[in-house]
């Protein structure tokens, strides 16, 4: 995994940096951490329904998965967020 700062955000890549290798963006905010994930809504396992229904088209516009968002506001949410990040990592090439 490779990380790269981008303004106030951190981009996470599987291997080398590049659009197709990017699998998540961490956005640090006053009220918590917002994470944009590369996701396949047909195979994503999200029993707690954290993933927003809205699809974004800012960071992941290469046709490999959709851009979805989760928010972390409590320490206790980190373990579940990591499970969602692992699924997103698997979609990056």
Across the structure, where does each feature detected by a protein language model lie?
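Well-ordered alpha/beta subsegment
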Residues: 57-93
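Short, conserved beta-strand/beta-arch hydrophobic-aromatic motifs that form part
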Residues: 5-68
